[in-house]
């Protein structure tokens, strides 16, 4: 069984082998029978002349392989025999020297008995050869306005044979400018040959074609090793666009096909389009599109196609660079400002140390008063142009970044202050608006001062008297009320008060006069100005000793200004005038007796009207009174050193103990120390030992019309004579009506109250409406000529003292009209005028040279 199966399998294998061999033999036989001998006649002629071309080489290619070849005779024909298989395509090519080769496909549908083919050759055009030192240029021989094809390459790329020279060279350049000329080039069948051998053939869509050669004298080609730059003008009917890319194909004569070599670009030269490419060698070139890329690849120029994108990128980069530059400048500015601020702080600390000792000087040590930081409201505008100005500096809690910011801030605040100082409504409405605050705050101030007086009256006494100026009210409206009291020369006294509203200051930063710390004091006498006035009328609190002035007083009556008593020139009728600075123990009994007599004398006579009472009586009774600048006369001002305004005073320095009562008596010659006529301010930061103090009759200097001031004086010497005389008349009428005792008796009677009690009085600021509007809110007068209406001292008793408002109302109801001025006062005025005539003979500089000099703190 097994043997028969094996025989059957063997028989099957043998049968398959025999059948395969037989089928292969039959296939080969059929193929051999299909390839038959075919004779092909090829006729070659000149395209331009149609003359036959002899000795032209005919070559037939089948699948890029030469199948047969032949040569034309004198008649330009050639008979070529070949094996042709039905269905295959043949490429018949004719070449001739000095002609552009041409080829044509041949593919019959059936096996022909006879076939003939004609090829026209395009003669190559001679070109102009230009050999330069660096390049070799070939230009078409046709000259004209239109662009001509051109070829150039480097001279060193040209390799001449050993026996050849440049004069043996001949150049040919042929460009197809018409479609029929393009047809004269070889058949446009492209091949994308690859290494696998599987070549695909396809037809090309031509754009233009060009042929260029460089031949030797024997007709051989001269090789060129290097890039060859070719530019060919395109036909006018071309539909290509600028920057379009068209492939460049080279004709391979060995295979009879076009091979892709490089990429050319379409460029615009004027109104003509050109195709430019780089050829690796000379030969036959065509610009054509392949079926895989039927349309030209148009590549837009990045500078035009992506303009917006590029601009956005550049803008972003510029913005980033700008931000980085700003940050760099910011940090550099901060680094530059830090050392400057540190240097300013060092200068400020040095200036503060010096100002503690040398801010202001007079007959005694003003540097015994230690300053603290205090912000003063500035309500004054521009100072009088005829007044020597001393510009004070104010330490504030705000630092300015630059000098420009400081100057602009000062201008803004000065303008704001000037605008707010102008009256915007009736004075009566402003007064009624603040009347309730005045009544309440005045009572509170009187009670507080009485409480401190009772607690400090048992303390030991010092030789100095302190004056504390407390504002009467501290409302958020911050209205400045300036009272002016006048007594006209008519039959009945006419007392009027003029008030000027001031700007409200809800925030300290808005109206505080801020100035740089470097400018502590101006060094020029031409830049002296009146010191900044108080914001509004306040309390004048007189203490017998500096020990009664403690920190608790400041906390209850802030803002406060403490001034030694001998720095203030009080009016002649004031009880503190010519008061001795030394009160010995032996005089204590006499003082108490005089105090009792003074109390009895005050009960017998009506008290004088205070400034506040006169103002209130006038506002209550004077309905319909016309406010006029002719009725308002400014009294002579009390000038305070500007440095005292800068540093609010808190405590007395320990050096006050060095000036004992005995030393003061020795300096005064046993007589009370005269009141100072001027303050002297250290403008250059020197110590008190280097400052000379002088005493000059500033009242006389003001009477002779001089507008000059001492270099070290802060006194306003520009007081009008008319204001002084009218003020003297008013005081004379008041004194005669109230029947005051003589000046010496009045001083002796009022010395009793100085020892134990604290007197409260209302500061009166009189304004001169004839001055510039910027001085409306500032009450300034010299200390010698100041004659405010001061209230009588309060009674010393254990009972509760009536408030200031109640006392004012009581005095107002009990007051009577004041008579006219007495003849005695008129006589005094005449004496003053006589003194003016005598003083006019001396110039201010002579009086300055004649003043006595006195130096303090000599060591």
Curated annotation (Swiss-Prot):
Pfam families: FAM171A1-2-B_C (PF20771), FAM171A1-2-B_N (PF10577). Belongs to the FAM171 family. Residues 21-307 are extracellular. It comes from Xenopus laevis. Glycans are attached at residues 163, 194, 198. It is found in: Cell membrane. This is Protein FAM171A1. It comes from the Eukaryota. The chain crosses the membrane at residues 308-328. InterPro entries: FAM171, FAM171_C, FAM171_N. PANTHER family: PROTEIN FAM171A1 (PTHR31626:SF1), SUSHI DOMAIN-CONTAINING PROTEIN (PTHR31626). Residues 1-20 form the signal peptide. Residues 397-421, 484-509, 771-859 are annotated as: Disordered.
């Amino acid at each position: 069984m097994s043997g028969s199966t094996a025989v059957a399998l063997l028989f099957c294998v043998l049968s398959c082998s025999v059948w395969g061999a037989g089928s292969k033999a039959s296939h080969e036989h059929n193929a051999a029978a299909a390839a038959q001998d075919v004779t092909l006649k090829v006729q070659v002629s000149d395209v331009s002349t149609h003359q036959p071309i002899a000795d032209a080489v005919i070559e037939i290619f089948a699948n890029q392989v030469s199948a047969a070849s032949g040569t034309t005779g004198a008649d330009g024909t050639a008979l070529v025999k070949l094996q042709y298989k039905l269905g295959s395509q043949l490429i018949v090519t004719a070449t001739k020297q000095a002609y552009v080769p041409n080829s044509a496909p041949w593919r019959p549908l059936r096996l022909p008995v006879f076939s003939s083919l004609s090829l026209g050759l395009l003669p190559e055009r001679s070109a102009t050869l230009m050999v330069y030192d660096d390049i070799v240029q070939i230009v078409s021989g046709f000259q004209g306005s239109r662009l001509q094809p051109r070829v150039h390459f480097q001279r060193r790329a040209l390799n001449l044979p050993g026996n050849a020279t440049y004069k043996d060279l001949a150049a040919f350049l042929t460009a197809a400018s018409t479609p029929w000329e393009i047809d004269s080039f070889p058949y446009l069948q492209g091949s994308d040959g690859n290494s696998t051998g599987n070549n695909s053939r396809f037809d090309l869509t031509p754009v233009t074609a060009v042929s260029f050669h460089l031949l030797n004298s024997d007709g051989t080609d001269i090789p060129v090793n290097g890039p060859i730059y070719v530019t060919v003008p395109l036909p006018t009917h071309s539909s290509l666009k600028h920057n379009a890319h068209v492939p460049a194909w080279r004709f391979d004569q060995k295979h009879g096909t076009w091979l892709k070599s490089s990429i050319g670009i379409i460029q615009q030269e004027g109104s003509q389009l050109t195709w430019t490419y780089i050829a690796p060698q000379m030969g036959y070139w065509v610009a054509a599109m392949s079926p895989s890329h039927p349309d030209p690849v148009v590549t837009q120029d990045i500078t035009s196609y992506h303009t917006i994108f590029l601009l956005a990128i550049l803008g972003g980069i510029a913005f980033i660079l700008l931000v980085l530059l700003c940050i760099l400048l910011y940090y550099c500015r901060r680094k530059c400002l830090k050392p400057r601020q540190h240097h300013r702080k060092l200068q400020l600390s040095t200036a503060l140390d010096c100002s503690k000792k040398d801010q202001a000087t007079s007959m005694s040590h003003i540097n015994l008063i230690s300053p603290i930081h205090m912000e003063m409201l500035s309500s004054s505008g521009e100072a009088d142009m005829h007044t020597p100005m001393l510009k004070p500096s104010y330490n504030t809690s705000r630092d300015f970044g630059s000098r420009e910011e400081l100057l602009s801030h000062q201008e803004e605040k000065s303008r704001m202050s000037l605008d707010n100082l102008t009256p915007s409504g009736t004075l009566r409405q402003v007064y009624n608006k603040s009347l309730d605050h005045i009544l309440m705050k005045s009572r509170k101030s009187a009670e507080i001062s009485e409480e401190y007086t009772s607690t400090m009256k048992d303390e030991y006494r010092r030789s100095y008297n302190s004056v504390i100026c407390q504002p009467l009210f501290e409302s958020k409206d911050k209205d400045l009320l300036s009272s002016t009291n006048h007594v006209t020369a008519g039959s009945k006294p006419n007392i009027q008060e003029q008030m000027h509203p001031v700007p409200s200051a809800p925030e300290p930063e808005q109206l505080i006069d801020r100035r740089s710390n470097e400018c502590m004091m101006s060094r020029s006498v031409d830049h002296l100005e009146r010191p900044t006035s108080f914001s509004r009328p306040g309390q004048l609190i007189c203490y017998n000793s500096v020990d009664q002035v403690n920190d608790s007083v400041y906390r209850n009556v802030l803002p406060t200004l403490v001034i030694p008593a001998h720095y203030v020139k009080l009016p002649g009728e004031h009880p503190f005038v010519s008061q001795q600075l030394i009160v010995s123990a032996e005089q204590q009994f006499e003082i108490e007796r005089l105090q009792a007599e003074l109390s009895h004398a005050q009960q017998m006579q009506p008290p004088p009207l205070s400034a506040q009472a006169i103002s209130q009586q006038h506002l209550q009774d004077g309905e319909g009174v016309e406010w006029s600048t002719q009725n308002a006369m400014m009294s002579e001002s009390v000038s305070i050193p500007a440095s005292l305004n800068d540093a609010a005073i808190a405590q007395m320095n320990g050096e006050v103990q060095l000036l004992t009562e005995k030393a003061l008596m020795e300096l005064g010659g046993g007589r009370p120390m005269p009141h100072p006529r001027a303050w002297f301010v250290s403008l250059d930061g020197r110590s008190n030992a280097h400052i000379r103090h002088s005493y000059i009759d500033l009242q006389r200097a003001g009477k002779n019309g001089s507008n000059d001031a001492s270099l070290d004086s802060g006194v306003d010497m520009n007081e009008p004579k008319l204001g002084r005389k009218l003020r003297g008349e008013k005081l004379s009428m008041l004194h005669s009506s109230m029947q005051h005792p003589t000046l010496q008796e009045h001083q002796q009677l009022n010395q009793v109250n100085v020892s134990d009690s604290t007197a409260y009085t209302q500061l009166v600021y009189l304004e001169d409406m004839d001055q510039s509007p910027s001085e409306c809110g500032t009450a300034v007068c010299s200390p010698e000529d100041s004659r405010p209406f001061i209230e009588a001292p309060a009674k010393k008793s254990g009972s509760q003292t009536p408030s200031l408002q109640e006392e004012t109302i009581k005095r107002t109801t009990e007051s009577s009209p004041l008579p006219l001025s007495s003849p005695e006062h008129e006589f005094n005025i005449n004496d003053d005028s006589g003194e003016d005539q005598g003083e006019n003979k001396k110039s201010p500089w002579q009086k300055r040279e004649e003043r006595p000099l006195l130096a303090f703190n000599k060591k």
